[in-house]
Amino acid sequence: TFLVSLSLEADVIRTFPLGPGGAIGQPQALGVPQGLGIADPSAVRAVEMAGSSFLIVASTGSSSLSVVEVSATGSMRVTDHVVDTLDTRFAGVQALATVSAGDRVFVIAGGSDGGVQLMTLMPDGRLLLLGGQLDLPGLALDNVSAITARLVDGQIEVFVAGEGAGITRLTIDIGPVAPMQTAGPEDGLLTGTEAGDLLLGRDANDRIEGGDGADILIDGAGSDTLVGGAGADIHVLGQDGERDVIADFPDVVANHQFAVD
C-alpha cells in the first residue's frame, strides 16, 4: 500500500510506502528532476489495468496528462504523457475522474478549455482519445474545477462543476463491454464478440476480427491483419516495423478511427 502526493513547488509525484500501523516510509519521486515534463500537478487518480497499477496525473501548468505505472516496490515508470492540442479539451487541466467498467478504464478530464475530454486507458498504459464535449449554452463546462463520474446501469454518469452557474450532467453510453482478449503466442485468429471488445495482438502474425460491437483493435509486434467489422471501431497500430493490413478499410473509413503509435 502506498500514499501518493503531488508537489506544486517541486513539480514531482511521490509514493510513500505504508508500513505496519500506518507508518510512512521513505518516498520515491518522479517529476521534472527525472525528466517528466509537468508543471503544477493538480490531480491524481489511481487505477488498475490488466494486472498493473497506474496513476493518472493532471498538471495545470503544462496542460498535460501523465500515466505512471507503479510497481510493487513503489518505483514509478512513465507509460504515457500527452499535452493538450487544438483537437482536445484539457488545457489548464485541474479536474480528473476515472471509471472502471469490466476490464476497461475510462478517464474524464477538464480545465480552462471550455469542455471535457473522454479517454480510455490501454493495457500498456497509453491513453486513447474517445471524444469530448464542448461548452454549449445551457452547460457549465467553462473553467472546469471538479468532475465526478460513476458507472450506472452500463452508462457513465458524469457531473461537472465549472465557472458557469449550476452543475452539468453528462451521460456516456459505452454500450455492452466484453472482457479483454489477448492473442496467443503463435500465429492465429483472435475473434471478438457482439459487444464492445478490447482485442490485443502479441508478437506473432495475428488476424484480429472485432465483430459487431464498438471495438478497439490493437496490433502486436508481428505482421497483423485487423478487421473491425460492424460498429464504430478504433484501430491502433504500433511502430513495429512490420506490414499491417486493415482488411475492411474501404468499408470503415466513414465510421472508424485510426491511431498510430
Predicted regions: what they are:
Residues 1-178:
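Feature marking well-ordered beta-strand scaffolds used for ligand recognition
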Residues 6-7, 24, 59, 111, ...:
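Structured catalytic/translocation cores of nucleotide/phosphate-coupled proteins
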Residues 39, 91, 142, 183-185, ...:
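Short, solvent-exposed coil/turn segments
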Residues 174-200:
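Extended, small-residue-rich solenoid/repeat segments and analogous flexible loops
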Residues 187, 196-261:
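Acidic, glycine-rich calcium-binding repeat modules characteristic of RTX/beta-roll
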